[in-house]
Amino acid sequence: MTLVSKTFELYGKTYTFESGELAKQATGACLVKQGDTTMLDTVVVSKERKNYDFFPLTVDFNEKMYAAGRIPGGYLKREGRPSEKATLTARMIDRPIRPSFPDGFRNEVHIVATSLVADQVNPFDVINVMGASLAMTLGVVPFEGPLACVRIGRNVETGEFIVNPTYEERENSDLDLELGGSADFISMVEAGAEEISEDDMLAAMKFGQEALAAFCQAQDEFVAEWEQVNGPIVKKEYPLDQPVEEVQERIFAHYDEMAAALRDADKLSRIGKVEALKESIRAEFTEEEQAAWEREIPVALKKLEKKAMRTMVVETGERVDGRAADEIRPIMVKDNYLPLVHGSGLFQRGQTQVLSVLSLGMLNEGQRLDTIEPTEGKRYMHHYNFPPFCTGETGRMGSPKRREIGHGNLAERALLPVLPDENEFPYAIRVVSEVMESNGSSSMASTCGSTLALMDGGVPIKRPVSGIAMGLIQEEGKTVVLSDIQGLEDFLGDMDFKVTGTTEGITALQMDNKATGLTFDILARALQQAKEGRAFILQKMLDVIPEPRHTTRSTAPRIVSIQVPTDKIRDVIGSGGKVIRGIQDETGASVDIQEDGTVFVGGTGESVDQAVERIKLIIKVPEPGEEYTGRVVSIQPFGAFVNLLPGKDGLLHISRVAKGRVEKVEDVLNVGDEVKVVVIEVDDRGKISLDRLDKPEAPARAEGSSEGDGEHFQRRERPRRERSERSDRPRRPGDNGGRKPRRHHDAE
């Protein structure tokens, strides 16, 4: 195998594909670069087919901190549990690739994306789909390719779309749209947006489809060059689970029974009826037939259920729960659901129920991110939990799974555009959405529940956000767009298209599509139908809580911000943090200082006011004419130093400590005495001169002492040594007895 490398320019960016040098024992491997960002994508396919009734695909993103020149945090100092970004990247790679494999493929497939270089300029996530696509192509894996993924941004100043924007370009973009698919087919969409219109979103998707085609063509060119160097790629045959005609005929004879079993609005009741029917159908096969067709019978039963559900929708216009295509399930909304917490909301739509709970904290309680991205942290966090009881099942509880992380991220992106700026609302914000019941669209219920919790907690969001999940059925040449899909319609349908937004526009999108016949006209219809559904749901929410509460809960921390001159930051912090720790210990408030001098003070009760007052005193510069009651902290022969404010001392000169002449400051003042003073001068170096208010009379002096009345005071004569005594000591070189050397002048 000979190394092949090809570099090309697309949409103002440089890309490189390489293969033939690294990971040669994998089924396929490809190195892909954007700028200096370098990713290695590998694929391994098991030699034996597994006895599964599903496609066993696993995608891992191997985030290496050395790619960004960093050492991992933590005690072990090595990579461990995947970060949230790594999990989301793995999902991004998985979603466009999974539907590209043929039905019945049961060999295990493992795709691993490894970060080798993260140049902090070009994002590393979307290019992995191209790398995985090329690895599968070169490894002769059976899939519908080539595939690509692109990110589309939009410059807020010019309105121009940008393909795969840099981190800097993303900062100036009101759209973050990720599209995955082939040259003529979009299978995955993930987006966050600053309330943009449906028309603008559709235009961005069309532009992205053109970019997908360009990147797929670049892959074809690389493969052609590879074959010129290494010879033609020979197609491999993998066994597929194929339906047995006899099994299908016998099972599909029960079509009417399946259609009847599916007609039930209650999820658990419907599942019970369908499973009972499947068992009765399975019992019609002999033990020998069941053993021979162990894999074929479950597949055929699933196809029967799918066919009955889909045909019902396209032929009658009625869904399994009796709703019309654009009808939304009954909605129940409650705010202020839990006492004492900082905010809460309960949102129920049909048999999907989510309780969202708000927690507020200091900004330094936000999440710090230890990733290879330049992003250091985030202030708003949304966490989505999907316990087994929400579907009436048993199971293990533990760390969040990939699906929970993905759904939580979607609801997080949905609310980000409407959150207040941290200068307006200086809090770290966490919302946890607990799924109490689930029958589809739980992520959209989490979005609605998060809005309720934020408004209930007094977070001044710009506009409330609602969300809806749209579906698609394409059967027998007919197309039906479904609003507010439930679990069965998601599982057996062709599309899961989630849309969130406000009255002003879209804030987030997520789509997984299996229908090759999806057109932009259908997408436009789905977006418009989603807009109408979002408005209906939003009104139900506003009927309960029309606007955010004007104040936060009494149980929430109170946070205020003050501005400190940057040259005073060290005064507030103190040596080794001594001053700021003292403020926090003595007041009970939390203090967080930013590099620009913004200080956030948080706490409960009077602790915030006390801490703010302490900080103001530290940064205050005394002005001439201001009066203080200070404490004497030091006495010198020339005067006393009086502490006016924390870290601010002024000099009370000896001539100003009392009326009349004072020989020694200690005769009038002692360390620790309180004294009323007035500032008379602050020089250019910040030195403060004081005068004493209500000066006392200077103490009377003993007889013979000078009181400044003109009398001469007699010095006590000290015994004088004879010169001979002084001359006895040895003279040092250059010693002139303390006298300056006499200068000799030449006579003129």
Tell where the protein language model's regions lie, with residue ranges.
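Single-stranded RNA-binding regions, centering on S1/OB-family and related RNA-binding modules
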Residues: 557-559, 566-748
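Long, charged amphipathic helices and adjacent flexible linkers at domain junctions
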Residues: 233-242, 536-562, 608-629
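Glycine-rich, flexible beta-strand/loop modules in the N-terminal catalytic cores of phosphate-handling
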Residues: 26-110, 115, 119-122, 183, ...
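Conserved phosphate/anionic-ligand binding catalytic regions in large, soluble enzymes, centered on
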Residues: 28-30, 122-140, 335-358, 439-459, ...
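Flexible, glycine/charged-enriched surface loops at secondary-structure junctions
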Residues: 103-109, 144-146, 215-234, 289-297, ...
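Mobile "lid/hinge" segments at catalytic clefts and subdomain interfaces of large enzymes
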Residues: 140-264, 454-550
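Extended amphipathic alpha-helical scaffolds
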Residues: 1-46, 51, 234-373, 557-571, ...
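Long, basic N-terminal domains or extensions that often function
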Residues: 1-235
